[in-house]
Amino acid sequence: MNTIRYTLLTVLTLISFHIFAQPGVSAGNLQFTIKKMSDNVTFGVFVKPDATIAPSKRTSTGSGQVTLVTSKDFTYDNLVSKGGTWVENARVNSPIEAPDNAYISFGFVTDEPKIKLQSNEETLLFTFVPADDYDGSISLIENNNDPFSTPNSYGTNPGNDLGMMDFGVAGGIQYYTYANNYFEGMDNGPAILASEKTEAAQPKAIFAAEKGTASLRSPK
């Protein structure tokens, strides 16, 4: 009976939290970044808790979205989910607001493999490999400043979002939401490969500091 009650509570809370945790929420506790992996070819999208929270192991993810901003000729292969299951669910090429850009959104489907948060550490969400001939930039959308942010000419909802609940902290259920992006030059800590339960320091990607975009050029 206790199991049934807990399951019902989880489902109902996730439904209500999904409504609350939408792209563009201005206050939150979770930060995203994108960088190259150790092979210098694959790109990874990571989440990290900010300094205000200390997540327990009893978290549950209810919603999520990651939107990449690339050149309009961008293509990729080998999308691999590492924390949660992610699928491409929208793409817009050359909108009038940013005709040189493409906006590719990846939606969260299920918390399998589970997204495991740890204080001051990165968790890898998914990876992908850009086409060999692509030499443009790849960055995460800035929800509040991008020219294609909602409302836009396509009536779409690009943006970054992650909504989680923590059942294991004192004081009752805690809610964590996406806050902003962070970039290289910060102390990112070790990465957590959620599906493999291993920790490995990630190499530094080359970023355009003023834009937070990852370059495909190899480090010199």
Regions found by a protein language model. Name each.
Residues 1-8:
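Bacterial N-terminal signal peptides that target proteins for export
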Residues 21-42, 177, 183-220:
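Boundary/junction segments of secreted and surface-exposed precursor proteins
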Residues 26-31, 35-91:
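Low-complexity, serine/threonine/proline/glycine-rich extracellular segments that form mucin-like
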Residues 33-37, 46-48, 69-71, 107-109, ...:
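A structural detector for beta-sheet-dominated domains
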Residues 46-47, 89-137:
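Structured beta-strand segments within beta-sheet-rich domains
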Residues 47, 57-59, 79-99, 117, ...:
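The transition from N-terminal targeting/processing segments to the mature protein
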